[in-house]
Curated annotation (Swiss-Prot):
Superkingdom of origin: Viruses
Name assigned to this protein: Uncharacterized 16.0 kDa protein in segB-ipI intergenic region
Organism: Enterobacteria phage T4 (Bacteriophage T4)
Amino acid sequence: MSINEYYVYAGDYANPSHFEGNLIPDKVFNTPFEAWSWIESKNGFSYRYVEVTDWRGTKYPKDHYYVNPSKVNFLLFAGDNYYPCGGYDDLIAYAETEDKLRDIIKENENKPDYGSNRFDWWQIVNAHTHAIVDRG
């Protein structure tokens, strides 16, 4: 087992990761999202309980690590200083509509939740065309 590997456990009883026999064999993933995406792609996945864990047994719940791709239409890249980190390191949020991202930008003006200050710069990007929709 490696530090950057994630595993799927599935069974008919709660906490399937507590039993080594519930490990889905030959399936190792690079991210929790990749693992949950694989699970979602299995329409006939008939297990009652499913968990994604890392090598330490840390659980990665679906509601925090998986988003239905059809609900991701816009991406918000932003930073609290002049110099961006670069690429997806600057990804702050994603949403179905631009308005939801604009709300995050406005909320951060009054009470910074991302970084130590309000956004020094931001960009809203269309997730499908990769075009910058707005910037500030």
